[in-house]
Amino acid sequence: MPYAEITVNLGKVTLGEENRKKMTNSCLKRHENSSLVQAVCALLNSGGGVIKAEINDKSYSYRCHGLGQDLETSFQKLLPSGSQKHLDYMQQNHDLLIFVKSWSPDASSLPLRICSLRSNLYQRDVTSAINLCANGALELLREKESRAQRGTPRLHSQDHILNRTIQEEEDIKMCALEFLKKDKLNFKEKLSFTESTHVEFKRFTTKKIVPRIKETLAHYVSAFANTQGGYIIIGVDDKSKEVFGCKKEKVNPDSLKTEIKNCIEKLPTYHFCREKPKVNFTTKILKVYQKEALYGFVCVVQVEPFCCVVFAEDPDSWIMENNIVTRLKVQQWVEMMLDIQSDPSSGFPTINDSAHLMTPALSAPRRPAYLTKVLEHKETLQRHFFSVTQENLQFQPESLCKKLFSDHEGLEDLLKAQTHPCSHGIVIFSRSWAGDIGLMREEKVLCDALLVAVGSPLVLYTILTDPSSTGRADYTQNTALQLKRQLQTLGGYPGKICVIPRVIYLASRGSRPDQPPVYYPRPYTLSSKAEVEDLLQGLVLVSLCSRSVLSDQLGCEFFKQCLEEQANTLSRNLQESRELFIHCLPGTRKTALAIKMVEKIKDVFHCKPKEILFVCENDSLRDFVMQQVTCRAVTRRTFMREEFPKIKHIVMDETENFCSRHGDWYVKAKSTTHPKANGAANEHPHHGILWLFLDPFQVRHADGSGLPVPSAQFPRKMITSEIHCAVEIAKVMKDEMKRMQENPPSMGLPDTLATFQEAPYEEAMRAGALPGVCEIKANLTPEQIANYVAEKCHSLFHEGYLPQDIAILYRRREDRGQYKDVLLKAMARGTTEVAFNSAADVCADGIILDSVEQFSGMVRNIVFGLCPESVHSEGVHKLCFASKAIKHLYLLYGGRTAF
């Protein structure tokens, strides 16, 4: 089949109400029913798919004859909120195709992560053993899990509860206990108690008593064990309460006890506790006499309350495993119901390194923690990058499209022709959508393009240069299927979704001739702008879990939005804290936050730009700030040299690297923002803002900074909860800060280094850091470093990155001469012409090549950190390099010292 779906071929099936009524083979009818409903259940739990049923009756028409009442009833039991939400039907010649949407629970119910026919988890309800529905099973599992987590001891009885509430139940229970103490019974003796929550009577009149006992015992044991325990009394009539027993000719007592023991010990259990005890039960055989002669036996099974949960058998719940409909085991079922991670050490999962995302059985994997934060911004991100207009289709991302269209003549026209007449949506390009979502790339593929438009299902175009570039036959199919799965799981798209794969050739300007048309039911077409936007928001989440140019562009915008939120929160301190020392750890984007505060000061105090002063150490940062925000910006040296009578508010950045050589800048700043009264009684001195931003881990010199001692830096605000970079980069910074705490550098202050705490920083990484890249190479010559940088840059340009995304930084100004010429020579061998700019031209189009000090306060998506010394002699520079990178960090070291 041409569908990019998990497909179940059922073989021949009798369909239609009249045809199924006429079936004389009841076993075959039940088999067809169960096979079909199990396949539906498996696909529901495995991301959806297609069931292909070969129609037995060649005159059958789905439109005229329908499915058959027994099949419809089974689907209704499986999907009580309405099977039409998940199932669609389409007849193709002599095949009926059932399109199954991925399982999504009813919004008003508990969040059931999987669908089940029966839980086979029983509880006692007065005189009945109830096979719990999915909601009831989930409630019981959560209750037992919570009790185990609290360390509540296992209760062997609940006398203290029953005595207060249901005395009758306790009386019956005590009668059953007394009954158990008897040695013999009389035939047709009437018992003084009845069935209850704790007592079940059973009488079997069949010839084969032992098989019937084994048949029914499991669900009664499960029910009593999962409730409060109880007694199964076999050989007593449940209506008359008379003792009949099991005739001695039909039952061997010892054999019966063995069968019961084997049956109970085989029952599947799931433990939340550490002790993991077995089901505790007692079996007693009572002799029944008729006129002093042995007539038979009554069997009593006493079941104790169980600490966790006991199942009668594995749940009737199914998944697709290796394209086979497979029944879930208890362990799998409980873990999926409760969203329990099998491997809690997985850390920071991404698409590219999470192989479990490929497993259909785990079609709803745990989302990475950072997506929780992204969910708050997905709509804004979608509108920023994928704005859906009624004009022409938009091709995104722009940088990659520009590269592709300039390198391959006719590609843009080919895609416009293929996507016609769609005009209300987006076409999203990638060098390899397969690589983006964790599959193997195909070298012969020129690019992939995903159409998301009103009036069309999703279509994935794979563009090859010509028919001879066949590549792997299953490339497009697998990519389309995996993309669909991740839009459902990571993207959380709730609607019916398909991705139709198509291969097209650039040379012939057309599709592959052997591709059959692919049809889906109408609900799989995106019918409105709202549906397109919902799906694009899901695509935002999927992209942010990958590593691609689109992911990086989305990630940088996401960090900007988080930074804006953080600035809004921090600005609430403006009124109450006119002076504030803000300690920011690496990765928290200190300078960007300081710049945001300038805008907030203008908004809060309604002051003019000329009344706000931004003070920093370097000319390059000063120039950058002046391009970002409207205010006065000066270096510390200029601040000490000039007077600023009109300034009311001062924001100072990088104060950890200020110095007092030109005077006491702190005293001057304080006297500027908090001038003393001139003696007039009716004059009130102005109290402006003086906020000082510093990073205690990035002190670059041993001279005194001029800051007050740490104990005098009050009031103080710690910025540690937001990490605005890739998780791989954040890990480098975390390790360096930990190392510096353990071995403080000569210019650091142990008191301020103590602000770093590993656990909260890791929590911030999990909550906000996105996937990225960090590579470290050592023992390289300058030429090897230059070649590595050039190859990596041209590879990135091929993927759609731009020169202005990149900064190449070295440790000291004097290192520039060592690297510039070899870098220019190496870069000249590539196809993209690039220019190197200094940090002073950070807003120009070109690669930044400058010292890490001159680039202070600024960031780039991609940073190369060059160090001629060995990795062990680099001091705090690894931290400085890392703090300048957002998504990619490449640390390249010379020297001969190995790791």
Curated annotation (Swiss-Prot):
EC nos: 3.1.-.-
Cofactor note: C-terminally truncated SLFN14 endoribonuclease: Requires manganese and magnesium for its endoribonuclease activity.
Tissue specificity as recorded in UniProt: Expressed in spleen.
InterPro entries linked to this entry: P-loop_NTPase (IPR027417), Poxin-SLFN/SLFN_N (IPR031450), Schlafen (IPR029684), Schlafen_AlbA_2_dom (IPR007421), Schlafen_AlbA_2_dom_sf (IPR038461), SLFN_GTPase-like (IPR048729)
Keywords: Endonuclease, Hydrolase, Nuclease, Nucleus
Record-linked PANTHER family: PROTEIN SLFN14, SCHLAFEN
Name of the protein in question: Protein SLFN14
Gene name for this UniProt entry: Slfn14
